[in-house]
Regions:
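C-terminal lobe/tail of nucleotide-utilizing enzymes
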Residues: 18-119
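Inter-motif core of Ras-like GTPase G domains
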Residues: 1-9, 14
């Protein structure tokens, strides 16, 4: 799994990660954008702190599946720091994080399915 963030220069780092994985014959399940946005606690609007996401374009450029976008969440960060992540948030993780985990699991299982025997 390649993890990126919304900044423009990150696409250069993604290129290095993809090239390294290909040279080492390591399959890439997809790409996740971390720190994608923060949700305003007053109005619920998503604010793109680091600028507009270019995740879809980066993913398309390397033929990667977008597995999800994770927000900046101060409550999640505090729970991680306190070691109380399992009890601090509903179901232990943000819904976005759960969706990313499920997408990774689906991709991993799809890649792990045995090939059809040759006739």
């Amino acid at each position: 799994v390649v993890v990126t963030s919304p900044q423009d220069l990150v696409s250069m780092i993604v290129a290095k990660a993809v090239n390294m994985a290909e040279k080492m014959h390591v399959p890439i399940l997809g790409i996740i954008e971390n720190m994608s946005y923060i949700t305003c606690p007053d109005c619920g609007r998503k604010i793109e702190v680091f600028g507009q996401s270019n995740l879809d374009e980066v993913a398309a450029g390397y033929d990667l599946k977008v597995l999800g976008r994770l927000p900046i969440d101060p409550a999640l960060a505090a729970a991680c720091d306190d070691g109380t992540i399992e009890s601090a948030l509903p179901m232990g993780l943000l819904p976005e994080a759960l969706a990313v985990c499920e997408a990774v699991e689906v991709r991993a299982n799809a890649d792990a399915e045995p090939a059809e025997p040759e006739a």
